[in-house]
Structures are given as structure tokens and as C-alpha cells.
């Protein structure tokens, strides 16, 4: 029984490390992992480490938002805070992962992050996924 517990722990740690590498590579692809100011991207502003857009921030549950704080202010602040923006991405992925049947791991994370809820079905996310994959060597 101890052997199974150890094996489960090793698998859990391996998955956690792979996800960490995936998020780090997405950060590199998006901003060279720098807290960039907001900039226009495909008709709307993208901000911070992961180039988060306002609707994405709202979909991820507005982490870090203070009571009474305007959502735009919270979004810009969160996007420039690595921990807050990572929390946002994880919540977003958890919310929309069901939209990607047959996809898993870093491919699912990358395509949802880049293409939104339907990102796993969009041709335009393939090149983005290839950039992330070449960084981390993950699947």
C-alpha cells in the first residue's frame, strides 16, 4: 500500500511541475515574463505578464479585486502581479477545460489561454501552442 501512495505522490508532483513549466512558457511567449503595460492586441487591451484582457479577467472571477474597486483598475493591477495573474489563468482554465474534450495538459492550457473558451477548436491557436511547446517540450 505504501508503494501506491508513493507512486501517486510522484505522479502528482510530476503533473504540478509540468503545469508550472507550461505557465512559465506561456509567460515567456506572451511577455518574455515581464509585467508589460497594457497594449492594443486584436482590437482590445492586453496587459501584464500573460497579456490578460478585461473579459478574460472577468471570466476568471476577478482575483485580487478589492471591495468597491473598479474592475478595470483591478484587472490592470492583477495582470502586472505574477501571482494574481497566475491565479486568474488557473481559474479560467478550470472554468473552460470541459470545452476541450480529448485535449489535456499544456496544450489545453495554451489553447484556452490564447483562444478563449473555444480555443481548442480554433486553427489560429495551433501556432501559439507550438511556440509554448517548443519552450517547455511538454504535451
What is each PLM-predicted segment?
Residues 14-18, 25, 127-128:
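Secretory-pathway extracellular proteins and peptide precursors enriched for disulfide-bonded cysteines
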Residues 28-73, 85:
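Secreted/periplasmic proteins that engage bacterial cell-wall peptidoglycan
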Residues 47, 127-130:
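A general alpha-helical scaffold signature found inside nucleotide-binding enzyme cores
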Residues 57-120, 129-139:
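Alpha-helical segment that forms one wall of the substrate-binding/catalytic cleft
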Amino acid at each position: 500500500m505504501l508503494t501506491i501512495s508513493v507512486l501517486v505522490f510522484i505522479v502528482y508532483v510530476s503533473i504540478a511541475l509540468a503545469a508550472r513549466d507550461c505557465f512559465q512558457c506561456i509567460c515567456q511567449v506572451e511577455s518574455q515574463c515581464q509585467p508589460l503595460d497594457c497594449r492594443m492586441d486584436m482590437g482590445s487591451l492586453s496587459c501584464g505578464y500573460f497579456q490578460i484582457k478585461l473579459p478574460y479577467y472577468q471570466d476568471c472571477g476577478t482575483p485580487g479585486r478589492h471591495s468597491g474597486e473598479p474592475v478595470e483598475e483591478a484587472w490592470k493591477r492583477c495582470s502586472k502581479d505574477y501571482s494574481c495573474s497566475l491565479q486568474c489563468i488557473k481559474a479560467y482554465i478550470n472554468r473552460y477545460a470541459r470545452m476541450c474534450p480529448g485535449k489535456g495538459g499544456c496544450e489545453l492550457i495554451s489553447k484556452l489561454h490564447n483562444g478563449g473558451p473555444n480555443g481548442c477548436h480554433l486553427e489560429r491557436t495551433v501556432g501559439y501552442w507550438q511556440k509554448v511547446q517548443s519552450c517547455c517540450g511538454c504535451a
